């Protein structure tokens, strides 16, 4: 290697080290608008704090991520966790309370029957042990994570095989 190549490598290594120190990926700070989501169907909203955002992401990844990575639904690619799909459900699942209710007792997309025996939920915690240790607050922050993601990842969240 000549001197110029070694110099370039050193400069690139330095820039990389500085960029990871100055702009760490884990320190994404969301503004209040991005952290504000619908609380209920009456139009009330809730602003999640940074700790709730982090906890929601962690719980989503550990309890829901194996089937819903990136907001998709592996068992039914036609219905994801994107806002369009959540709005289209009956009743709509586009707010914290509706998603918490769904995680407690999931219903089909048209709302006609319970699917608790085939979808992890609090109601079916005996079949799906991952759900046993989740409190109402845990469900709330998971729902918050689901609703914040479209604001962060826009079309990628729930975008399916195109992105993941």
Swiss-Prot record:
Membrane topology of this protein: Peripheral membrane protein
Source organism, top-level taxon: Eukaryota
Entry keyword set: Chloroplast, Electron transport, Heme, Iron, Membrane, Metal-binding, Photosynthesis, Photosystem II, Plastid, Signal, Thylakoid, Transport
Compartments in which it is found: Plastid, Chloroplast thylakoid membrane
GO CC aspect terms: chloroplast thylakoid membrane; photosystem II
SUPFAM superfamilies linked: Cytochrome c (SSF46626)
Signal peptide: 1-27
Single GO MF descriptor: electron transfer activity
Binding site for heme c: 64, 67-68, 119
Cofactor section: heme c
Manner of cofactor binding, per the entry note: Binds 1 heme c group covalently per subunit.
Main localization category: plastid
InterPro entries: Cyt_c-like_dom (IPR009056), Cyt_c-like_dom_sf (IPR036909), Cytochrom_C550 (IPR029490), PsbV_cyt_c550 (IPR017851), PsbV_cyt_c550-like (IPR016003)
Annotated Pfam families: Cytochrom_C550
GO BP: photosynthesis, light reaction; respiratory electron transport chain
Function text: One of the extrinsic, lumenal subunits of photosystem II (PSII). PSII is a light-driven water plastoquinone oxidoreductase, using light energy to abstract electrons from H(2)O, generating a proton gradient subsequently used for ATP formation. The extrinsic proteins stabilize the structure of photosystem II oxygen-evolving complex (OEC), the ion environment of oxygen evolution and protect the OEC against heat-induced inactivation.
Description of how the protein assembles with itself and partners: PSII is composed of 1 copy each of membrane proteins PsbA, PsbB, PsbC, PsbD, PsbE, PsbF, PsbH, PsbI, PsbJ, PsbK, PsbL, PsbM, PsbT, PsbY, PsbZ, Psb30/Ycf12, at least 3 peripheral proteins of the oxygen-evolving complex and a large number of cofactors. It forms dimeric complexes. The extrinsic subunits in red algae are PsbO (OEC33), PsbQ', cytochrome c-550 and PsbU.
Family: Belongs to the cytochrome c family. PsbV subfamily.
Record-given protein name: Photosystem II extrinsic protein V
Organism of derivation: Cyanidium caldarium (Red alga)
